[in-house]
C-alpha cells in the first residue's frame, strides 16, 4: 500500500509570535481567568513530533483547536524558520479548517465581554450593558451608526496583556502581501 497524504493549511509564523501567543493564552487561562474552559496541550503530550502546542477552545458543543508546529520545511526566505499554526473547528467526528478572522469571530461569540449592536437595544430598554468590547479582533465589519457613535463616546480600554487573537498570531510579513504605491500616486495595490 502506498503512502496517503493529507493536505492542510498551516500559516507560517515566526517563533516569537508563537511564544507570545502561548504566553497570552496561559495568562488568560490561569491568571485573569478570561479564557475559562480553554485547554492547553504541551508538545510532550502529543504523539506528533512536529506539534509544539495545541489550544482547545470549547465553542458550545464544538471545539476550536489552534495547533502550533515546529520543524517544518522552511520557505523561500531566510526568516521562514519552519514554525507555523493551523486552526481547526471540530464537532463530533466532523472537522474543518477555518481562517484566522473566522476563528476570532467564533471565539468572540462565546468569550470576552462586548459592547455590540445588541447592547444598544438593551441600553434603550434600560438594561445594564458592558461599556466596551474587550476583544475587537472578533469584529470584522463596520458597525451601525449608533454603534460607531457610542464606540467613539467610550474609548476602548487597553487590556494588559492583550487577549490572544488568532489573527494577530498568523498575520506577518509573508501572510499579508506588502502594499506598494501604484503608478498614480498614493493608490495602493498588492505588490509581489
Curated annotation (Swiss-Prot):
Keywords: AIDS, Host cell membrane, Host cytoplasm, Host membrane, Host-virus interaction, Membrane, Metal-binding, Phosphoprotein, RNA-binding, Ubl conjugation, Ubl conjugation pathway, Virion, Zinc. Residues 164-192 are annotated as: Disordered. Residues 14-17, 74-79 are annotated as: Interaction with host APOBEC3F. The record marks 150-151 as: Cleavage in virion (by viral protease). A motif (BC-box-like motif) lies at residues 144-153. Pfam families: Vif. A motif (HCCH motif) lies at residues 108-139. Residues 54-72 are annotated as: Interaction with host APOBEC3F and APOBEC3G. GO terms for cellular component: host cell cytoplasm; host cell plasma membrane; membrane; virion component. The modification Phosphoserine is found at residues 144, 165. Residues 171-172 are annotated as: Membrane association. Processed in virion by the viral protease. Highly phosphorylated on serine and threonine residues. Homomultimer; in vitro and presumably in vivo. Interacts with viral RNA and Pr55Gag precursor; these interactions mediate Vif incorporation into the virion. Interacts with the viral reverse transcriptase. Forms cullin-5-RING E3 ubiquitin-protein ligase complex (ECS complex) by interacting with host CUL5, RBX2, elongin BC complex (ELOB and ELOC) and CBFB/CBF-beta. Within the ECS complex, Vif interacts directly with host CUL5, ELOC and APOBEC (APOBEC3F and APOBEC3G) substrates. Belongs to the primate lentivirus group Vif protein family. HAMAP family: HIV_VIF. Vif-defective viruses show catastrophic failure in reverse transcription due to APOBEC-induced mutations that initiate a DNA base repair pathway and compromise the structural integrity of the ssDNA. In the absence of Vif, the virion is morphologically abnormal. HIV-1 lineages are divided in three main groups, M (for Major), O (for Outlier), and N (for New, or Non-M, Non-O). The vast majority of strains found worldwide belong to the group M. Group O seems to be endemic to and largely confined to Cameroon and neighboring countries in West Central Africa, where these viruses represent a small minority of HIV-1 strains. The group N is represented by a limited number of isolates from Cameroonian persons. The group M is further subdivided in 9 clades or subtypes (A to D, F to H, J and K). This is Virion infectivity factor. It comes from Human immunodeficiency virus type 1 group M subtype B (isolate OYI). The gene is vif.
